[in-house]
């Protein structure tokens, strides 16, 4: 479980329509992180963005884009990130991965989370 102190925040940028085999890339990554014992991860869907092709994809009332930006993000120890990075690179496909040093000032507790729910 993630503790307070130095950690790494990993952001994986994908296109909404990207797939790993037959599954959405973000779902494959989230499943892998869950099975790997990561404390928590989130998936964020953007309303507009562009990638290396420099073509802007955005939500419009006329047509919904299937190439909107999606970001999977989690924070974990350097050792755990190093352990997972090879598989994450495979699952991200043509997406990009960004890693930033960060400091966790308050880590979630399973006991407290269970009591709140």
Predicted regions and their residues:
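Positively charged, small/polar-rich N-terminal and surface patches that mediate targeting and assembly
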Residues: 1-117
